[in-house]
C-alpha cells in the first residue's frame, strides 16, 4: 500500500494532536530514532564544539557589578539602556550585582557597559 505525498499530508491534516503524538511515538519505535535527537543537529548547523563556542560569543549579558558613588546618573543610564521605569531601574541598581541586559549583540553590550561606566558604575560584559 503506497501513499502519495498529497494523500499522506491530507491524512496527517485530519489527525488530532493525540493521534499525531501516537504517530511520532510509533515512528520512533519502528525506526529507532528520537524526535529530540533529530532537533539537536539542526540547531548546531553541523559544526562541532567550535560552532558551539562561536555561538556562545554572539550573545552577551551586561552586568551591573556596583552602582558607585553617583547612583542617580547610574539609574538614568539603566533607564536609557533598558527602558525601565524609575522604580524598576532604582531597584535594579540597589540590588547590584544584577544583569542589566541579557542575550544582546556584542556591540550593543559594549555600548551599554560604556554608558554605565561613564555614569560612575562598575559594569561587566559576560
Curated annotation (Swiss-Prot):
InterPro entries: Ribosomal_bL12 (IPR000206), Ribosomal_bL12_C (IPR013823), Ribosomal_bL12_C/ClpS-like (IPR014719), Ribosomal_bL12_oligo (IPR008932), Ribosomal_bL12_oligo_N_sf (IPR036235)
Gene Ontology MF annotations: mRNA binding; structural constituent of ribosome
Keyword set, alphabetical order: Ribonucleoprotein, Ribosomal protein
GO BP annotations listed: translation
GO CC annotation terms, alphabetical: cytosolic large ribosomal subunit
Protein family: Belongs to the bacterial ribosomal protein bL12 family.
Subunit structure: Homodimer. Part of the ribosomal stalk of the 50S ribosomal subunit. Forms a multimeric L10(L12)X complex, where L10 forms an elongated spine to which 2 to 4 L12 dimers bind in a sequential fashion. Binds GTP-bound translation factors.
Protein purpose: Forms part of the ribosomal stalk which helps the ribosome interact with GTP-bound translation factors. Is thus essential for accurate translation.
Listed name of the protein: Large ribosomal subunit protein bL12
Gene: rplL
Amino acid at each position: 500500500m503506497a501513499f502519495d505525498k498529497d494523500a499522506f499530508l491530507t491524512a496527517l491534516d485530519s489527525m488530532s494532536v493525540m493521534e499525531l503524538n501516537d504517530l511520532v511515538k510509533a515512528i520512533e519505535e519502528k525506526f529507532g530514532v528520537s524526535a529530540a535527537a533529530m532537533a539537536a543537529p539542526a540547531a548546531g548547523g553541523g559544526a562541532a564544539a567550535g560552532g558551539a563556542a562561536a555561538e556562545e560569543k554572539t550573545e552577551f549579558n551586561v552586568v551591573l557589578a556596583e552602582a558607585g558613588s553617583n547612583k542617580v546618573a547610574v539609574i538614568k543610564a539603566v533607564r536609557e539602556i533598558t527602558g525601565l521605569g524609575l522604580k524598576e531601574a532604582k531597584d535594579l541598581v540597589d540590588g547590584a550585582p544584577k544583569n542589566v541586559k541579557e542575550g544582546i549583540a556584542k556591540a550593543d553590550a559594549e555600548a551599554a557597559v560604556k554608558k554605565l561606566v561613564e555614569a560612575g558604575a562598575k559594569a561587566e560584559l559576560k
